[in-house]
Amino acid sequence: MADETRRAAAAELRRVHQGLADDGFALTTEWDLGLPPKCAKNLQGTYFDGGRLRHDDGDMPADRERARDVVLYEWHDGKLALEEYETIAIWDRSDIKGERIHQRVALLQDPQAADLIETFLSLVPEQRRQARGTFGINLFRTHSNVVTKPHHDEEDFIILYVLDREGDGAESYLYKHEEGDAETGEQVLRHQLNPGELMIFEDSRFKHGATPLTPPAGGQAKRDVLVCTVDLPTTYLQRATVS
């Protein structure tokens, strides 16, 4: 990365950190963060079009194809150490009770994906970073409803990175957290993420979701997205103590 590109990316990180501090969310792009050209296209071709996704019975929305990875990270003097975590299991998510284990993709074997994970973890302001934690990466392809309803993921931060979209709709929204239905809170964001665009937000402050996809004339709608979670300690590392 050239010096000028590094400086621009560092300035963009500071802007994202300030947005999170002020508003609880921030929008950015792969270009502003200094990610490699065609990063989204490369990831889509390798994982989404490369036969790495699958549909699991009972998953919602019913037309979703997905894969997942979980990475253990540690910060040391501003540097990250990454390794694959021992499990990708999730429990009691999306109104589905019990344990689920989806298709795993070992992203750290891919240098570009590993660099992307480092960049995503750097989006978290330094004062909010856990010294050691887990990072979930969900690869979702959907054709109709992106999500079933406004919700929390019960994690620390959520990152959305859209790789590709065919058709319209899929407008991401955030409502300020209030007890009861999400619509009773103030909507603070409604934005259609285009390929190469990202959003990060603090999960506890908002209920989030997205509008349904609308197919193009004579075609089929599709959205390929990474939904990443900077996990709370209780998701994995402290799970045994709270079970």
Label each residue range with its predicted role.
Residues D32-G34, T142, D164, E179, ...:
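Short, solvent-exposed loop/turn segments at secondary-structure junctions
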Residues L72-T134:
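Signature of the catalytic double-stranded beta-helix
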Residues H76, F140, V162, E202, ...:
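Structured loops at beta-to-helix junctions and adjacent beta-edge loops in soluble globular domains
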Residues H17-G19, A62-D63, Q127-R129, K149-H151, ...:
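A general structural signal for short secondary-structure junctions and capping/turn motifs
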Residues R129-N194:
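Catalytic core of non-heme Fe(II) oxygenases with the double-stranded beta-helix
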Residues E171-S243:
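Catalytic core of Fe(II)/2-oxoglutarate
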Residues M1-D95:
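N-terminal auxiliary "cap/dimerization" subdomain that precedes the catalytic jelly-roll/cupin core
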